[in-house]
Curated annotation (Swiss-Prot):
One of its GO terms (biological process) is proton motive force-driven plasma membrane ATP synthesis. This is ATP synthase subunit a. CDD domains: ATP-synt_Fo_a_6 (cd00310). F-type ATPases have 2 components, CF(1) - the catalytic core - and CF(0) - the membrane proton channel. CF(1) has five subunits: alpha(3), beta(3), gamma(1), delta(1), epsilon(1). CF(0) has three main subunits: a(1), b(2) and c(9-12). The alpha and beta chains form an alternating ring which encloses part of the gamma chain. CF(1) is attached to CF(0) by a central stalk formed by the gamma and epsilon chains, while a peripheral stalk is formed by the delta and b chains. Belongs to the ATPase A chain family. The gene is atpB. It is found in: Cell inner membrane. It comes from the Bacteria. Keywords: ATP synthesis, Cell inner membrane, Cell membrane, CF(0), Hydrogen ion transport, Ion transport, Membrane, Transmembrane, Transmembrane helix, Transport. GO terms for cellular component: plasma membrane; proton-transporting ATP synthase complex. Pfam families: ATP-synt_A (PF00119).
């Protein structure tokens, strides 16, 4: 429900502001007067992403410790289904040999899903608690709606792409891949380098921006519904959108995982 002291425009803008720290002074940034500097840290995005990552570790560790060969409980069954699904996806799509890929894919899928799931919380719940109980000027609770988080994850995948490319093909083989494809002639090396360089760099950029764009749009729709409609009518649009958004949340986590597996499989192929 929008604050009585805010116009709809103020309400929407308020919910799109991150809790930021100026790294030059280590002080909180005024969301209404942000500094014109790159050196800021989105504390809320970092906090919720770390907390959700720890939640993932605690959940899976507790299930692993209590796993039995007998009849599993409902929670253990759900975890086993997720693990089996991810393992099957890796087996079908990754053609190299690495023990890292399956755990990485599982971590990405569950972690991104949990970050996306924060979008289903009531839009004012955690920001209200943060503002009135903790005195924080702004709070955004969906880490995957922050481009810094999604591009950071994509950058991690990009580093792994480079690592596996060099590991499987060697530095010379990787250099040849960049300079002698698609035109296998020394005269086309500059053209090949531009084409392959753009293709290589587009992978992390598209990976991060796709997740960010979908989650930012979903978050914005919830904010628009809450900011423009009276409280008693919001459920008419909120409920159908939340139900549909469950599909988006799961699908975006799956796409991020699948593209990571595919990119690493391509990097692991020997030419």
């Amino acid at each position: 429900m929008a604050s009585e002291n805010m116009t709809p425009q103020d309400y929407i803008g308020h919910h799109l502001n991150n809790l930021q720290m100026d790294l030059r002074t280590f002080s909180l940034v005024d969301p209404h007067n942000p500094p014109a500097t790159f050196w800021t840290l989105n504390i809320d995005s970092m906090f919720f992403s770390v907390v959700l990552g720890l939640l993932f570790l605690v959940m899976f560790r507790s299930v692993a410790k209590k796993a039995t060969s007998g009849v599993p409980g409902k929670f253990q069954t759900a975890i086993e289904l997720i693990v089996g699904f991810v393992h099957g996806s890796v087996k079908d799509m990754y053609h190299g040999k690495s023990k890292l890929i399956a755990p990485l894919a599982l971590t990405i899928f569950v972690w991104v899903f949990l970050m996306n799931l924060m979008d289903l919380l009531p839009i004012d719940l955690l920001p209200y608690i943060a503002e009135h109980w903790l005195g924080l000027p702004a709070t955004r609770v969906v880490p995957s709606a922050d481009v810094n988080i999604t591009l950071s994850m994509a950058l991690g995948v990009f580093i792994l792409i480079l690592f596996y490319s060099i590991k499987m093909k060697g530095i010379g083989g990787f250099a040849k891949e960049l300079t002698l494809q698609p035109f296998n002639h020394w005269a086309f090396i500059p053209v090949n380098l531009i084409l392959e360089g753009v293709s290589l760099l587009s992978k992390p950029v598209s990976l991060g921006l796709r997740l960010f764009g979908n989650m930012y749009a979903g978050e914005l729709i919830f904010i628009l519904i809450a900011g423009l409609l009276p409280w008693w009518s919001q459920w008419i649009l909120n409920v159908p959108w939340a139900i549909f958004h469950i599909l988006i949340i799961t699908l975006q986590a799956f796409i991020f995982m699948v593209l990571t597996i595919v990119y690493l499989s391509m990097a692991s192929e020997e030419h």
